[in-house]
Amino acid sequence: MIRNSKGFTLIELLIVVAIIGIIAAIAVPGLLRARMSGNEASAIGSLRAVNSSQLNYNVNCANNSGNAPSLANLVTPPLGGGQPFLSPDLDDTLGPPVKSGFTVTYTGTNPVVSALATCNGAAAGTVLADYLAVADPTAWGTSGNRHFGTSEAQTIFQEMTNAPITAISAAGVPVPATATPIK
């Protein structure tokens, strides 16, 4: 009796599945590292956007008297019309925004008491002399391996350990002191 052997044998199929598994095992860690690098680049971009919008806000909305009291104030357009100073995806009205695996938080200090009301409705005296914006990974080691922070001095710092940046002094020294500026 003649057998008509069309198709693949079980051994051939197992070899193909094993090869695909080996290729996947090699590729997946690289893809995860690339995703983490992309998340970190997005966090740096978000902090640069905060710095840029604060400068624009100070000059064009706060009469050179200081910085916005919140990210929500930066995403509010001027009362006379126009574009907001910051993208709405960083609005902190409902809590700290999460963007690309990083939580962006903003705190301000030292209200400028003599400041007038701003062009987008911030009350007189709510403009701030100092601010700290930080971007922390939502899952350390998964969404990012670095913490980032910036202040009114416009320098962005990175911390390579799992220790968030909690302050940047007027002299430009970050806390923790092991944080380094990004070039």
Residue ranges and their predicted role:
Residues 30-47:
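Aliphatic-rich helix starts adjacent to a transmembrane/signal segment
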Residues 163-166:
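A short acidic/small-residue loop/turn micro-motif
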Residues 49-146, 150-153, 160, 175-183:
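Extracellular/periplasmic head regions of type IV pilus-like filament subunits
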Residues 25, 40, 56:
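Functionally critical, cavity-lining and gating residues within the transmembrane helices
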Residues 3-31:
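N-terminal single-pass transmembrane signal-anchor helix
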